[in-house]
Amino acid sequence: MASILKVDKIRVTGLDSDSISFDNSGNITFNKTVTGDNAAMVKLLETDVTSSVSELVINGTYINETYETYFISLSGAGSADGYRVHCQFYTSATQSGNGTIASGSNHGHGTHSMQDTGTHNSDTDTECRLTNSTIGNSTGEGYLLWGYLLGANRTDVPVQFMGQQTTFYTNGSQEACNFVGGMVTPGTYGAYYCRGIRLYHNSGTIETAKLKLYGIK
């Protein structure tokens, strides 16, 4: 037989206010801060850039064996007129450590504009290009992107970062784009763990940016 606990308030011993209270309809009010990581998405990192930096690096402190999939959002603006957003991956043959960026042409990418026939792709590159067209540096010009980092702990297929972005050309026009970037040479890097990602502009510096990283359960 099931037991039933009937209460209308829960208070921790020694406190002078309730932590949880219930009304006559069964609605719950939390009067104290709720913490923990039971949500499907767990925020791991939030970074605000307010002065020039050359790159944003998320290392093995955040991208490690804890999660298979990660969600990244990034918005920003650059110093150069006519830049693109690129990335590289830190990979490791072992689960521990921060990994290294592979030398040689072991990155691949593809971008496709939603507004015209513009595409760009390569499966033998030293970096991944995430934005299709060049981005301006006038007031209001910049980019916003989001993507899923997939397969961080798989050892049968290389890690990939895929998502969507919107940018503003050097003339202020908007472009929406799909992108995929990741490790290639699957015979080698399919067995490697991803232990970080480096985000940067192919010219100039990152002047302002907001970066968020979530682990996906």
Task: Annotate each language-model stretch with its function.
Residues 2-217:
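Surface-exposed molecular-recognition determinants
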